[in-house]
């Protein structure tokens, strides 16, 4: 797999160009990452990211503008070090913690398992059931309930249910221990 110097893979990513070199992408930006849009008047939009310094140019087709009037009233924080997840909701002038739970983040086991990426993302897609395959095959391995895709192949989801089981699993004793997901 092709990746940049920060380890961000080209697959399902956005090319980031330096303002002085628009022929070859210098880095890759994560799909779904929240960025600051500085100028959208040309084919290449000028942006700033939270994880790299400076300004970057990105093809406009990869940028979904969010109006200044849009506010976020829900947030999810994933602690990859301590294997926890917290959900918050903005109510009035306060952010309320709605839940704090043990979680299992992504493990490094290429080519199928990837670490949970760090960053600030906007949810790209929601699925009641995310069907997954057995690694390296086209055989259905099971499903993960309540899946929200935030970047590339990264999802926040409920406890995976391996086939042939069909009923939901509410809790797993491995949650909050070590990175196990992919």
Describe the residue ranges of each PLM region.
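Surface-exposed intrinsically disordered loops and tails
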Residues: 2-5, 162-178
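SH3/SH3-like beta-barrel superfamily modules
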Residues: 26-64
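Gly/Pro-biased beta-strand-loop elements
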Residues: 40, 59-167
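Active-site nucleophilic cysteine motif
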Residues: 148, 179-182
């Amino acid at each position: 797999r092709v990746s940049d110097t920060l380890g961000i893979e080209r697959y399902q990513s956005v090319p980031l160009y330096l303002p002085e070199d628009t022929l070859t992408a210098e880095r890759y930006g994560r799909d779904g990452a929240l960025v600051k849009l500085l100028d959208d008047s040309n084919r290449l939009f000028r942006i700033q990211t939270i994880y790299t310094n400076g300004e970057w140019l990105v093809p406009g087709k990869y940028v979904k503008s969010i109006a200044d009037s849009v506010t976020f009233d829900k947030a999810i924080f994933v602690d990859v070090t301590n294997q926890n997840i917290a959900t918050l909701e903005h109510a009035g002038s306060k952010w309320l913690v709605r839940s704090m739970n043990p979680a299992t983040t992504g493990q490094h086991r290429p080519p199928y398992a990837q670490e949970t990426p760090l960053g600030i993302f906007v949810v790209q897609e929601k699925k009641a059931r995310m069907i997954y395959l057995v690694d390296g095959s086209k055989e259905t391995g099971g499903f993960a309930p309540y899946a929200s895709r935030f970047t590339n192949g990264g999802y926040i989801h409920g406890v995976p249910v391996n086939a042939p089981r069909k009923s939901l699993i509410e809790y797993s004793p491995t949650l909050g221990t070590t990175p196990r997901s992919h």
